[in-house]
Amino acid sequence: MPLVVQEQGSFQHILRLLNTNIDGRIKIMYALTKIRGVGRRYANLVCKKADVELTKRAGELTQEELERIVTIMQNPTNYKIPAWFLNRQKDQVDGKDYHVLANNLESKLRDDLERLKKIRSHRGIRHFWGLKVRGQHTKTTSRGR
């Protein structure tokens, strides 16, 4: 079934949101999940808060709708998204709740692992040695490292 578009000039086949290329032919809720740190539930909530139709394709959105989506994703607490919905609650550094996206998520995870290694915790040492971290058995598995 081919995709029918009303105005041929306004459709974008590839969008650039938060340093991520997004396919414009996918519905907006699923297209937002291509951004690292955004799942289906968070994408659904952001679209509802931004008053964007979930049936629209990502390439059909106007620039104003895209800006609304990005501002809600970057500042979720300003739009009454609860703290339990965020992916970084009670941060170790300042104790605040954040929703970390895209490149910031990778750097935060790397910083967390470095902190664990620095304080010589059990998890940090296991990461440093390249072993399983969460209590799995290692007698016969994971010998390739």
UniProtKB/Swiss-Prot annotation:
Q: How does it assemble?
A: Component of the small ribosomal subunit. Mature ribosomes consist of a small (40S) and a large (60S) subunit. The 40S subunit contains about 32 different proteins and 1 molecule of RNA (18S). The 60S subunit contains 45 different proteins and 3 molecules of RNA (25S, 5.8S and 5S).
Matches recorded under InterPro entries? Rbsml_uS13_C, Ribosomal_uS13, Ribosomal_uS13-like_H2TH, Ribosomal_uS13_CS
The record's listing under Gene3D superfamilies reads:
1.10.8.50, 30s ribosomal protein s13, domain 2 (4.10.910.10)
Source organism lineage? Eukaryota, Fungi, Dikarya, Ascomycota, Saccharomycotina
Q: Name one Pfam family in it.
A: Ribosomal_S13
Looking at the keywords, is Thylakoid present?
no
Name of the protein: Small ribosomal subunit protein uS13
* Organism, as annotated: Candida albicans (strain SC5314 / ATCC MYA-2876)
The protein's location, in the record's own words, is: Cytoplasm
Sequence similarity: Belongs to the universal ribosomal protein uS13 family.
* Key words, A-Z: Cytoplasm, Ribonucleoprotein, Ribosomal protein
Among the GO biological process terms of this entry, one is:
translation
Give Gene Ontology CC terms: cytosol; small ribosomal subunit
Signal peptide start and end residues: none
User: GO molecular function terms here?
Assistant: RNA binding; structural constituent of ribosome
What is the role of this chain? Answer: Component of the ribosome, a large ribonucleoprotein complex responsible for the synthesis of proteins in the cell. The small ribosomal subunit (SSU) binds messenger RNAs (mRNAs) and translates the encoded message by selecting cognate aminoacyl-transfer RNA (tRNA) molecules. The large subunit (LSU) contains the ribosomal catalytic site termed the peptidyl transferase center (PTC), which catalyzes the formation of peptide bonds, thereby polymerizing the amino acids delivered by tRNAs into a polypeptide chain.
